[in-house]
Amino acid sequence: VIYLDASALISLVTGRPYALELREFLAQSPEMPMGTSTIGFIETVRTLDRVGTYPTAMHDLLAAFTEILVTDEIRDWAASLPGGVRTLDAIHIASAQAIGDELAFLVSYDKRVLDIAHSVGIPIAAPGMGR
């Protein structure tokens, strides 16, 4: 599973910086499932509402990405992550962590998310960002 946080989803949908590199990265494993937390769907749609008109965003995201529900385990992992990470970002990291051995990468364009995810042993990727 390739987990995308909201920063990656927004780049992918809007064509923001690194969108081309992200599309190329994802195209390398077309059979690999992609997922995000329930929080990822909400964050992405709320941001898209502010930056443009994307009337089918939620439908499109739900069709392309597996939704990872916030469980007690994810809640507890998110609460116990090292300091320096925002609440929603902690939920993304914990959601990726919950995928376990099936997780190929957590994709993000947020340096704090990448640093903390890496520090707890999660494989990370930021295609085009030079990490």
State what each model feature region is.
Residues 42-45:
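N-terminal interaction/assembly modules
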Residues 30-34, 63-66, 100-105:
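Short active-site oxyanion
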Residues 4, 36, 69, 87-90, ...:
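Short beta-strand scaffold positions
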Residues 1-36, 47-62, 121, 128-131:
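Short, well-structured N-terminal submotif of metal-dependent ribonuclease cores
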Residues 63-94:
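Acidic catalytic patch
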